[in-house]
C-alpha cells in the first residue's frame, strides 16, 4: 500500500518525529511504500531525508490547503496517517489541521498521541472533527480508547488499540 505519514519527522528531535520514523521503517519491512509530510516550525529549518515529499510550516495556514491539494493529486498515495498531538499543528490548539482534513479526499487513519480527559472546548472540537472523518482511530491505551468513544464521540468500531511500544535496539 502507498502511505503518506503526516507529522513531525527527524532530524527534528521529538517523540512523535521518532515515532513517525519507526512507524515508517516498520511499514517498509512489510512491503508498503511510505512517504512523509513533515510539519516544521518554519520551512527549510531542517534538511529532511528524501522520503519527505512535502513540508508544512506549522503556523503558515496556506500550507495546510497546499498540503491537502498535494495529497489529493498524488496518484501514489492511497492512505494518509495523521499523527495528532495538539502542539504539532498551527493555530489555536492546532486547529489548522482541520483545514487540511476538510479538503482531504483520501482516507486517513488518525493516531492519537494525547487524548485529554478534561479538554477545553477547542481541543474537544478539534479531536471530534478529526475522529469523525477518519477511516480509523488509533489509541495507545485502553483509557484513551474509552475517551475517544465516550467523550470525543468517535465510532467505537473505528477505534483500535495499538500500544506505543519501542523500536528494536541492541542491548550492550
Regions picked out by a protein language model, each given a short descriptive name:
Residues 1-13, 82-86:
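Nucleotide-activated donor-dependent transferases that construct or modify glycoconjugates
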Residues 11-13, 21-77:
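N-terminal strand-loop element at the rim of the active site
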Residues 16-26, 96, 126:
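Conserved alpha-helical elements of sugar-nucleotide-dependent glycosyltransferases
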Residues 18, 139-140, 161:
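Short beta-strand scaffold positions
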Residues 54-58, 69-94, 109-111:
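Short N-terminal targeting/anchoring amphipathic segment
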Residues 85-89, 107-122, 136:
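A short, histidine- and acid-enriched strand-loop-helix "catalytic/donor-clamping" loop
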Residues 99-103, 107, 121-137:
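Membrane-proximal helix-turn-helix segments that form the acceptor-binding/catalytic region
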Residues 143, 162-165:
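Carbohydrate-associated surface elements
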Amino acid at each position: 500500500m502507498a502511505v503518506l505519514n503526516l507529522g513531525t519527522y527527524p532530524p527534528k528531535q521529538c517523540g512523535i518525529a521518532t515515532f513517525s520514523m519507526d512507524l515508517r521503517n516498520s511499514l517498509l519491512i512489510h512491503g508498503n511504500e511510505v512517504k512523509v509530510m513533515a510539519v516544521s516550525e518554519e520551512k527549510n529549518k531542517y534538511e529532511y531525508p528524501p522520503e519527505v515529499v512535502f513540508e508544512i510550516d506549522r503556523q503558515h495556514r496556506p500550507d495546510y490547503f497546499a498540503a491537502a491539494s498535494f495529497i489529493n493529486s498524488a496518484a501514489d498515495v492511497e492512505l494518509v496517517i495523521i499523527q495528532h498531538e495538539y502542539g504539532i499543528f498551527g493555530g489555536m490548539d492546532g486547529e489548522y489541521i482541520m483545514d487540511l482534513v476538510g479538503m482531504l479526499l483520501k482516507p486517513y487513519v488518525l493516531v492519537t498521541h494525547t487524548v485529554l480527559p478534561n479538554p477545553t472546548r477547542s481541543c474537544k472540537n478539534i479531536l471530534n472533527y478529526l475522529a469523525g472523518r477518519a477511516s480509523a482511530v488509533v489509541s495507545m491505551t485502553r483509557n484513551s480508547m474509552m475517551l475517544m468513544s465516550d467523550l470525543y464521540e468517535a465510532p467505537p468500531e473505528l477505534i483500535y488499540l495499538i500500544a506505543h511500544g519501542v523500536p528494536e535496539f541492541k542491548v550492550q
